[in-house]
């Protein structure tokens, strides 16, 4: 027995041969005398004194009585009892009730040899006195780990119970103060214990000094026997009659070392109202002995000298569960964990009621307590995590989850507190346990994978069904509370099965449906509008369904009954459900969601033929006279259009939605219901699987494969009498899913998503080289590109295209003029769009060459020509800027790569060389990117130790934003539940683009950080995978790319084919120009020689004569936006209406007949011959070039421009970092300590010159590049003097970063031709608009572009960027210069500033697209404005039918063309005087 547990509780008996030590009479007398003397001094008798006398039980416990007269004796009324008397008088306070009690509990069935949970009748007090002894025996294991045996002997017939344990015995010596033996002290005297020192933390069962004394008091005989190996003595003593009498202790010597404690007692059954220990009591005691076998570690437990087979807590739990399982069932799986030396925990799934079996310091806490709640709450929380994710039914609370938990706990608690002396419930606070029970992830994961989650979800489903049943409809003729319902008159009556409920897409569609009801009547048709899209009930939670107004309204209107299986529709208020939505992708989705709702909730209804109907309306109507063609899908219309001369001669009307139809249209639809009402076929078995595949989240992988089957052009055939559900899903619903993917996943060719492509298209179309507000640009883009998703979304798209901080775009196609966001918050800190301005980046047109624009496949949306299917840039932009998006069934992530690496690999491919391995690369990132697996990279920031407890962080992993790091440091500074405090302080020294934290750690924090590495501690590494690179290929099919090389190869093939097409187109255009120059020269020559007379002749006669003389008819060349599709469409509409002019021949010869009179000269003739030869030379040179050579030329141009950009970025980064370091150094000089990593050099990969970088960094006196004037596109491209090519008339410059010649705006330009570079350097224009001069911003982004390029060439030729004789073809208002100067004035005032004229009124212009002449066009060097007499080419002016100077229309001219002399080039633009006519087809224009 344990002396630590409760020495007051033990006396012993042992077996063996030993000598009886003589106890002298003297000593006995001394002992007696001493006891008597103490008794005399005491005010009341002491237990030791009373124990020496023999008394009956009635004599020991005086009773309070009243006299016969009813007058009480005050002295007998108020009494003081001894502690022993109080225990006997009030036993419930100490041992619980002494009356028989019936309750259900676990007992041991000896016949079945297993535990059994049943109702038993027992006396709690008797059970308690036995439990006190056996717990003390178990406590000895704590005091002496060598204890390995515990024996219990139970003899109900003889009414004897004995409990034996080996291990350390009770010291056999006399107590110094009490002068009696310690065994007698602790077993025969109440309130004696070894557990009163509260400063000593103990994990034993004894606590209050009662324990075994209670057993002694309620026994007729109580024997203590113990052996003390240290003193080689054995002690035995007996108490009788409820501890009222005792024998003298018998102390003998041990023959051999031994130690044990044994208690034998005979319960006073009379006190418990019993005459013997009955079977129920025996079964309880036996179960308690089994408890000890399971909870006392490494101890053999015997019952009546037979060892119990249970060993260990897990086996004990399995015994419990096996006993609780029916014979034909498998017992619940036990999930067990030995947490630590003080905690053993096991879990099993319960049957709907929380169960627990628990022990505290070997005490059976049958009612649980704080220890059980502590463990159970942890388990419930873990289960709740899974349930919340998977439960779509009724919400489940923690206590409801707990009902499915069965927990077993065996723990040791320091100085435990209980609710009473019966110790059934632990009340100790968790904080005072003295240990923690931290359940491992493995243990909790095993619980999550068990059937407990399934059981909880079943409960949630049952609860949801019960709640949903409350809203069941019925066959009611009148429904209230749904004001938007237009109810059928016969709904809910005996004719309800004939009624049709029309569900419309919105209120406007409802009004149209109601107007149609005037044709068919209101008796059998009802209408109810849906607000937006119906809820996806398959993925919705119970509360979402219960609170969804549309779902509940449909259920109420139709009269649905939850969980009912329908065989007919007679019990419904409506026998049919008809869907009326727009014939677009969203309308298809709504139909699918309604089908999904019915299949998920009432699948039997879909098996009833004719129950579900859809109402179809045309999406396009084509009319020609009395003929009408209606189309219900766009692909169907496209097929018809291709087969019918592109729809020429037909009037085409697009019906965007039901709102486009008017009331007359709707009445006509309802007049022909057989055509417009399409019944769905009864649902087949495979249909249910398809519906689940389309809408269930868990079917994502299957949905991917389904979407792979999509082929553009498929459509729903509405000529069928019935629509199969599988056809609807595979032909119509799939188009909605693909539309979602198309919005979210980029093209592999241009790397753009549709929204981004719309922005790029509009900016190219408007040549947006001057900034405009983002908010306004978003409106323009949405309007002109048929964008259907709101301007806010478009504004964000524009902002994303312009962002250039680390981790965003490697090449931003738009300029971020304003606060477009920084790496501090990953761009989320961008200003509102109304404060932001943007324009095209100079690199945009280098990457997206304008010569490709006319080769693209432009799309048409409802008759409006919009962006192409994809652009074909010279680099795969999907690799340059990466991609990320989530669609339907598919998501994508493609990292950014270095444009220089991409360019190098493209060169290798063009030259037939092997490719180099490419690693992800982010512009401005200075950390490291390391390949750790074939499809995985590790991205690391930079951290260095700069002091004993100090570190410096100068780079973060990609997309680990500065604010994220700051929040992590804050958490480490104050400490949180997940992060212990390990930081003393930190400082921030970073600017907009760089990262710089100085962090001071605690001593323990630094030690911990170094142990696990600074990189890990500060989360400075992340992984990036290339295993999900998804994009649309050139054919519009979604495709997964296994490697970067796969993307590069596919792009290479598409791009090379496009170069071949570009060359063919340019050759064709040069041939046309050659024919025009040749015919114009012959025309002038014939007039000069008198072979052709044009005066005094009618135009039609002249045309006849021109045909006779074999002059070629040449139509006006397309201009402006290369392929003006909108104009083409307008012409097509005119053709349909029969308004096209029949004088086509007149237009075809305008290039001759519109030539100005002054051009009919010999000089002009010679000039045209020369131009013809130049075009021929250019054509010959172009024909010799291969597509690969054209591509290589463009790559050269890009690399030149890219290097300039990287140089600017490099200088800015160096300056920003140096600024932060200078500030730190000025504040306090920081000594450098041990470095845990190598700092990356500050130079950025891709920089053209590291020497220049070093020089810039070291020169403190050199002015910052941020003060330099922002470079315009003209300045960017005009830094060196060009020279005409030796073999063709193409101008090239060494500084031509765009790879564009002076001829760029003319179709003859060939970017693929080489030329020698030998011109003199030419100064950029220094003139800046006074307004712009003071508002230039530091060069922090790619330099801003401008609308033209200035060049000095050998032959001056004036050229405009367009050639049209119509006023509508003048330069768009958005491109008109703000200041117009006269060429004439320039010519007369050499070197002097020309007079200026004001531009047109603001009403005629769009402010956002004004090109200020001073900033858009650089000044040219000075030469004579007047051409010499022998000049082959006089100055050519802007062509127009009307004298341009009369209306003073400002004409923008690119000053790079040859006819411009130096004085005129000093002016930014010019107008044509009214006394000159110009040739509408002069190539110099």
UniProtKB/Swiss-Prot annotation:
Compositional bias (Acidic residues): 1-16, 1473-1485
Predominant location: nucleus
Residues the UniProt record annotates as site (Transition state stabilizer): 834
Keywords: ATP-binding, DNA-binding, Isomerase, Magnesium, Metal-binding, Nucleotide-binding, Nucleus, Phosphoprotein, Topoisomerase
Site features described as Important for DNA bending, chain residue numbers: 886
Region (Interaction with DNA): 388-392, 1019-1028
Signal peptide positions (record): none
Residue spans of biased composition, Polar residues class: 46-59, 1260-1273, 1413-1425
Active-site residue numbers: 835 (o-(5'-phospho-dna)-tyrosine intermediate)
Pfam families (UniProt xref): DNA_gyraseB, DNA_topoisoIV, HATPase_c, Toprim, TOPRIM_C
InterPro entries for this protein: DNA_Topoisomerase_II, HATPase_C_sf, Ribosomal_Su5_D2-typ_SF, Ribsml_uS5_D2-typ_fold_subgr, Topo_IIA, Topo_IIA-like_dom_sf, Topo_IIA_A/C_ab, Topo_IIA_A_a_sf
Binding site for ATP: 136, 165, 193-195, 206-213, 421-423
Name the record gives this protein: DNA topoisomerase 2
Origin species: Schizosaccharomyces pombe (strain 972 / ATCC 24843)
């Amino acid at each position: 027995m344990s002396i630590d547990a409760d020495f007051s509780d033990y006396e012993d008996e042992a077996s063996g041969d030993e000598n009886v030590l003589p106890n002298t009479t003297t000593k006995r007398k001394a002992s007696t005398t001493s006891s008597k003397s103490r008794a005399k001094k005491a005010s009341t008798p002491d237990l030791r004194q009373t124990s020496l006398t023999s008394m009956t039980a009635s004599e020991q416990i005086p009773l309070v009585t009243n006299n016969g007269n009813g007058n009480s004796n005050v002295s007998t009324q108020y009494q003081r009892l001894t502690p022993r008397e109080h225990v006997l008088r009030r036993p419930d306070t100490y041992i619980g009730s002494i009356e028989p009690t019936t309750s259900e509990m676990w007992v041991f069935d000896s016949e079945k040899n297993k535990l059994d949970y049943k109702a038993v009748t027992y006396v709690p007090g008797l059970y308690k006195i036995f439990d006190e002894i056996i717990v003390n025996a178990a406590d000895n294991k704590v005091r002496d780990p060598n204890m390995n045996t515990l024996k219990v002997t139970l003899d109900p017939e003889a009414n004897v119970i004995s409990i034996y344990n080996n291990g350390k015995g009770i010291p056999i010596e006399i107590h110094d103060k009490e002068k009696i033996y310690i065994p007698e002290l602790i077993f025969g005297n109440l309130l004696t214990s070894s557990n009163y020192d509260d400063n000593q933390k103990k994990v034993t069962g004894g606590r209050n000094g009662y324990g075994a004394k209670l057993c002694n008091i309620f026994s007729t005989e109580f024997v203590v026997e113990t052996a003390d190996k240290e003193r080689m003595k054995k002690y035995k003593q007996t108490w009788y009659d409820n501890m009222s009498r005792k024998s003298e202790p018998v102390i003998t010597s041990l023959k051999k070392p031994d130690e044990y404690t044994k208690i034998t007692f005979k319960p006073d059954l009379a006190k418990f109202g019993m005459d013997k220990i009955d079977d129920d009591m025996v079964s309880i005691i036996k179960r308690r002995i089994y408890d000890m076998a399971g909870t006392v570690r490494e101890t053999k437990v015997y019952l009546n000298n037979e060892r119990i087979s249970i060993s260990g807590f897990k086996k004990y739990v399995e015994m419990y569960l096996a006993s609780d399982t029916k014979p034909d069932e498998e017992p619940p799986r036990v999930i067990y964990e030995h947490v630590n030396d003080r905690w053993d925990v096991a879990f099993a799934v319960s049957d709907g009621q929380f169960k627990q079996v628990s022990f505290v310091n070997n005490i059976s806490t049958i009612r649980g307590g704080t220890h059980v709640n502590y463990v159970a709450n942890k388990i419930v929380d873990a289960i709740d995590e899974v349930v919340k994710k998977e439960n779509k039914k009724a919400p489940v609370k923690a206590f409801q989850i707990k009902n499915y938990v069965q927990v077993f706990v065996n723990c040791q608690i320091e100085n435990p507190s209980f609710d009473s002396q019966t110790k059934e419930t632990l009340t100790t606070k968790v904080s005072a346990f003295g240990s923690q029970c931290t359940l491992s992830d493995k243990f909790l994961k095993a619980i999550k994978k068990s059937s407990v989650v399934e059981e909880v979800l079943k409960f949630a489903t049952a609860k949801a069904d019960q709640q949903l049943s409350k809203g069941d409809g019925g066959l009611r003729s009148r429904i209230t509370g749904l004001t938007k319902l237009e109810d059928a008159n016969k709904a809910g009556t005996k004719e309800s099965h004939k009624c049709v409920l029309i569900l419309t897409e919105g209120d406007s569609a409802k009004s149209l449906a109601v107007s149609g009801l005037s044709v068919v009547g209101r008796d059998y048709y009802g209408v109810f509008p849906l607000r937006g899209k119906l809820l996806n009930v398959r993925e919705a939670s119970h509360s979402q369904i219960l609170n969804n107004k549309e779902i509940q309204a449909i259920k109420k209107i139709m009269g649905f009954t939850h969980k009912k299986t329908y065989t007919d529709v007679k019990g419904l208020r409506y026998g049919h459900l008809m869907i009326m939505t727009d014939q677009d992708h969203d309308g298809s989705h709504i139909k699918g969601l309604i089908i999904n709702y019915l299949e998920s909730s009432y699948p039997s209804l879909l098996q009833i033929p004719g129950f579900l109907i859809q109402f179809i309306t045309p999406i396009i109507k084509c009319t020609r006279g009395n003929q009408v063609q209606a189309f219900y899908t766009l692909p169907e219309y496209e097929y018809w259009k291709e087969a019918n001369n592109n729809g020429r001669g037909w009037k085409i009307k697009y019906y965007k939605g039901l709102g486009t139809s008017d009331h007359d249209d709707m009445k006509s639809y309802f007049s022909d219901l057989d055509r417009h009402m399409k019944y769905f076929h009864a649902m087949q078995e495979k249909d249910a699987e398809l519906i689940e595949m389309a809408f269930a989240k868990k079917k994502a992988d299957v949905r991917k494969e389904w979407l792979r089957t999509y082929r553009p052009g498929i459509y729903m055939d509405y000529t069928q009498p019935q629509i199969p559900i599988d056809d609807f899903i595979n032909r119509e619903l799939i188009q909605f899913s693909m539309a979602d993917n198309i919005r979210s996943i980029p093209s592999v060719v241009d790397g753009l998503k549709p929204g981004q492509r719309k922005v790029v298209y509009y900016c190219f179309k408007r040549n947006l080289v001057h900034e405009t507000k983002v908010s306004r640009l978003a409106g323009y883009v949405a309007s002109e590109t048929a964008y259907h998703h709101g301007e806010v979304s478009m504004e964000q798209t524009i902002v994303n295209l312009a962002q250039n901080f680390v981790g965003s775009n490697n090449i931003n196609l738009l300029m971020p003029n304003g606060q477009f966001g920084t790496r501090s918050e990953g761009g989320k800190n961008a200003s509102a769009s109304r404060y932001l301005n943007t324009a095209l980046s100079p690199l945009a047109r280098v990457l997206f060459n304008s010569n490709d624009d006319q080769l693209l496949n432009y799309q048409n949306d409802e008759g409006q020509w919009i962006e192409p299917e994809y652009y074909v840039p010279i680099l795969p932009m999907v690799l340059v800027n990466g991609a990320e998006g989530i669609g339907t069934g598919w998501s994508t992530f493609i990292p950014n790569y270095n444009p220089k690496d991409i360019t190098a690999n493209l060169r290798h491919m063009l030259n037939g060389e092997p490719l180099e391995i490419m690693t992800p690369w982010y512009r401005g990132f200075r950390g490291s990117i390391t390949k750790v697996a074939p499809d995985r990279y590790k991205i690391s920031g930079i951290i260095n130790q700069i002091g004993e407890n100090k570190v410096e962080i100068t780079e973060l992993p990609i997309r680990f934003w500065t604010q994220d790091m700051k929040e992590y440091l804050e958490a480490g500074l104050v400490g949180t539940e997940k992060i212990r405090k390990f930081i003393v302080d930190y400082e921030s020294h970073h600017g907009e683009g760089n990262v710089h934290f100085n962090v001071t750690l605690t001593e323990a924090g630094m030690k911990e950080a170094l142990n696990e590495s600074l990189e890990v501690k500060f989360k400075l590494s992340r992984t990036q995978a290339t295993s999900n690179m998804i994009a649309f290929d050139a054919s519009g099919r979604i495709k997964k790319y296994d490697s970067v090389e796969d993307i590069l190869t596919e792009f290479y093939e598409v791009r090379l084919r496009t170069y071949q097409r570009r060359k063919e187109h340019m050759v064709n255009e040069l041939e046309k120009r050659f024919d025009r120059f040749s015919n114009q020269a012959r025309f002038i020559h014939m007039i000069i020689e008198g072979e052709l007379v044009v005066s005094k002749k009618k135009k039609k006669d002249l045309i006849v004569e021109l045909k006779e003389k074999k002059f070629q008819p040449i139509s006006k060349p397309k201009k402006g936006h290369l392929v003006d599709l909108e104009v083409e469409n307008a012409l097509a509409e005119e053709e349909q209406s029969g308004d096209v002019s029949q004088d086509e021949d007149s237009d075809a010869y305008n290039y001759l007949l519109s030539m100005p009179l002054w051009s009919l000269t010999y000089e002009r003739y010679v000039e045209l011959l020369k131009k013809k030869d130049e075009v021929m030379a250019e054509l010959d040179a172009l024909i010799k070039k291969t597509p690969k050579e054209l591509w290589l030329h463009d790559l050269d141009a890009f690399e030149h421009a890219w290097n300039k950009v990287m140089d600017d970025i490099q200088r800015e980064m160096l300056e920003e970092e140096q600024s932060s370091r200078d500030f730190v150094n000025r504040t306090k000089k920081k000594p450098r300590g041990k470095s845990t990593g190598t700092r990356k050099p500050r130079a950025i990969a891709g920089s053209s010159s590291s020497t220049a970088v070093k020089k810039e960094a070291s020169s403190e006196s050199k002015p910052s590049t941020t003060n330099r004037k922002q470079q315009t596109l003209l300045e960017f491209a005009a830094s060196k003097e060009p020279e005409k090519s030796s073999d063709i008339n193409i101008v090239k410059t060494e500084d031509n970063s765009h790879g564009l010649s002076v001829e760029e705006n003319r179709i003859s330009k060939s970017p693929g031709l080489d030329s020698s570079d030998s011109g003199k350097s030419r100064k950029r224009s220094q003139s800046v608009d006074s307004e712009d001069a003071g508002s230039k911003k530091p060069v922090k982004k790619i330099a801003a572009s401008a609308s033209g390029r200035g060049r000095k060439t050998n032959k001056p030729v004036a050229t405009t960027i367009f050639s049209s004789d119509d006023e509508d073809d003048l330069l768009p208002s958005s491109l008109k210069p703000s200041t117009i100067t006269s060429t004439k004035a320039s010519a007369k005032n050499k070197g002097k500033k020309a007079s200026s004229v004001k531009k047109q009124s603001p009403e005629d212009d769009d402010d956002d697209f004004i090109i200020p002449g001073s900033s858009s066009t650089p000044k040219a060097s000075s030469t004579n404005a007047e051409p010499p007499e022998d000049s082959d080419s006089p100055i050519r002016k802007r062509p127009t039918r009307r004298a341009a100077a009369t209306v003073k229309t400002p004409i923008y001219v690119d000053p790079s063309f040859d006819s411009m002399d130096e004085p005129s080039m000093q002016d930014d633009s010019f107008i044509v005087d009214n006394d000159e006519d110009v040739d509408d087809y002069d190539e110099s224009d």
